[in-house]
């Protein structure tokens, strides 16, 4: 018989202006609540009095008490302490200056609200600073909806690693676990948290950081994001007044990142590009004195008279290692497909009100033929090497060039198994190669199968909703396979779409969990049942194995 876990309650008294910091391990889950009438904040979100606030394993955060307060915690973590050294006063001063700009903009005395870029080295707490500033703006009661721009693909604010995003939260963002630092995106089930439906638009880099190899792809993605935000501000006056906060990758601290061969002396080119794209007026540098000086001397910064402000790194910022980051990435991808984890028994059984969380999701696994799902890669680095060209010739390729992935190739070359794919919307005008007769026949067959309402799921036989329809079916037989083989290598190398689709806003994500080379089919995990919204996907370097 399994031992019943007991819950130990501990009261902690906090001095005015102090923080209670904690670092949860893999087997630690806690819940906390405030017992005093004075407010207590977690990342500038006020805790609801007397309500239990669950926090999941691996989370590292802090509670801040502006006045003396008492909190109650279940099962104290192994690593926790109180500190009177806090950066909250500096963050509050920044917030007040930005709030003044918003109010002046609302009165017509300013063109728009603050547009802030946050920079710093790895593990400096950039996302936490951004979350605090967003929550401070949302907690004013003025109805602001600031934009949260996630340009750090290694620490995505809403979705999965490798993605860039724009979200517009309208309520304070909670801190429950690692997956949604800036709120969860809309799911297929009704959300029961006040911040459960944060409007989110996403773009796919497919890598954990910008590099000199993917710099051109990065520039185009940032331009598309800035264009989308500009369109939002034109239609939504409140969004324009509220301003935006832009989280950046740690790679932005490297001066030579993105430097082009024709201008080798240029420095911080991707930083300057983002400043121009989003029309940034304030740069916050966390702890890095040299970076603060370098940015202050940039010609673009001086010509635009931007405010470059340096704030100290919080003493509670934890230096994460590669294992910590990998754990966070796995948790983020799993949460995208399965939803938030259930409450541990020792927390869900607590007496009293509980801050509610989202429901778990039920992803669907199904098969889809290779010929039906077009998998592409973006970037010149995915093309054939120059050594493969005829003697004396050289290649001139677009940095946004699309390369079609041949799933029948060697595994170490194809690299599709357990890869996360981003689904992109393709319009008729995007096609540059006419659809073959076999593809048209297969689409007709798919529609027919979907009408029959049959679906094949892992371990569950056939169910309604997904449809054998993603192009599978016994009717293909050997003739279909022979036809695919007869078409030869040209079909696999041929990219029938314009390269612009590779940097387009994505519709969602799927994972290839198995590849059947005999049946020439993928097994795909999708977050929702039914037909895929598109059969064109962009592959990157992000992998995830569903081991739970």
From Swiss-Prot:
Keyword Signal applies = no
Cite the GO molecular-function annotations of the record. Answer: ATP binding; ATP hydrolysis activity; polynucleotide 5'-hydroxyl-kinase activity
- The biased composition feature labelled Acidic residues covers 479-494
Gene3D superfamilies cross-referenced by the UniProt entry: Clp1, DNA binding domain (2.60.120.1030), P-loop containing nucleotide triphosphate hydrolases (3.40.50.300), Pre-mRNA cleavage complex subunit Clp1, C-terminal domain (2.40.30.330)
Binding sites annotated in the UniProt record for ATP: 19, 60, 123-128
Q: Where in the cell is it found?
A: Nucleus
Give the family per the record.
Answer: Belongs to the Clp1 family. Clp1 subfamily.
Q: How does it assemble?
A: Component of a pre-mRNA cleavage factor complex. Interacts directly with PCF11.
What is the designated name of this protein?
mRNA cleavage and polyadenylation factor CLP1
This chain is encoded by the gene named CLP1
């Amino acid at each position: 018989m399994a031992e019943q876990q007991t819950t130990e309650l501990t009261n902690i008294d906090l001095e005015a202006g102090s923080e209670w910091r904690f670092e949860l391990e893999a087997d630690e889950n806690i819940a906390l609540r405030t017992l005093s009438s004075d407010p207590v904040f977690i990342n500038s979100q006020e805790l609801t009095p007397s309500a239990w606030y669950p926090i999941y394993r691996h989370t590292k955060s802090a509670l801040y008490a502006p006045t003396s307060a008492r909190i109650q915690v279940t099962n104290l973590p192994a690593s926790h302490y109180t500190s009177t050294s806090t950066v909250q006063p500096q963050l509050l001063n920044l917030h007040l200056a930005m709030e003044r700009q918003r109010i002046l903009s609302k009165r017509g005395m300013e063109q728009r609200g603050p547009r802030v870029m946050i920079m710093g080295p790895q593990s400096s707490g950039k996302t936490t600073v951004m979350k605090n500033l967003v929550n401070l703006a949302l907690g004013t009661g003025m109805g602001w909806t600031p934009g949260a721009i996630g340009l750090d693909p290694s620490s995505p604010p809403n979705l999965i690693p490798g993605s860039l995003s724009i979200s517009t939260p309208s309520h304070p963002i909670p801190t429950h676990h690692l997956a949604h630092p800036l709120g969860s995106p809309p799911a297929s089930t009704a959300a029961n948290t006040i911040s459960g439906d944060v409007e989110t638009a996403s773009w796919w880099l497919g890598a954990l950081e910008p590099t000199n190899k993917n710099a051109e792809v990065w520039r185009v993605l940032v331009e598309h994001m800035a264009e989308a935000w500009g369109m939002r501000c034109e239609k939504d006056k409140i969004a324009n007044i509220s301003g935006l906060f832009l989280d950046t990758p740690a790679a932005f601290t490297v001066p030579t990142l993105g430097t082009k061969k024709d201008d080798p002396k240029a420095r911080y080119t991707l930083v300057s590009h983002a400043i121009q794209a989003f029309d940034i007026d304030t740069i916050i540098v966390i702890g890095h004195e040299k970076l603060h000086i370098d940015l202050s001397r940039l010609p673009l910064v001086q010509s635009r008279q931007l405010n470059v402000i340096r704030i100290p790194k919080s003493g509670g910022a934890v230096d994460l290692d590669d294992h910590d980051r990998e754990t966070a990435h796995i948790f983020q991808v799993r949460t995208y497909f399965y939803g938030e984890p259930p409450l541990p028994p020792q927390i869900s059984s607590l007496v009293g009100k509980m801050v509610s969380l989202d429901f778990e999701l039920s992803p669907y696994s199904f098969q889809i033929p290779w010929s039906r799902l077009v998998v592409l890669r973006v970037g010149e680095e995915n093309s054939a090497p120059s050594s493969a060209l005829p003697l004396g010739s050289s290649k001139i390729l677009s940095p946004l060039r699309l390369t079609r992935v041949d799933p029948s190739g060697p595994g170490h070359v194809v690299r599709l198994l357990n890869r996360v794919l981003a689904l992109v919307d393709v319009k008729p005008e995007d096609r540059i190669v006419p659809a073959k007769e076999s593809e048209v026949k297969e689409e007709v067959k798919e529609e027919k199968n979907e009408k029959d309402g049959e679906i094949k799921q892992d371990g569950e036989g056939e169910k309604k909703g997904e449809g054998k329809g993603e192009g599978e079916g016994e009717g293909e037989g050997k003739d279909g396979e022979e036809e695919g083989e007869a078409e030869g290598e040209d079909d696999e190398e041929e990219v029938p779409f314009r390269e612009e689709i590779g940097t387009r806003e994505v519709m969602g994500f799927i994972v290839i969990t198995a590849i059947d080379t005999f049946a020439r089919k993928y097994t795909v995990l999708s977050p929702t049942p039914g037909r895929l919204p598109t059969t064109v996907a962009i592959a990157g370097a992000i992998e995830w194995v569903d081991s739970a």
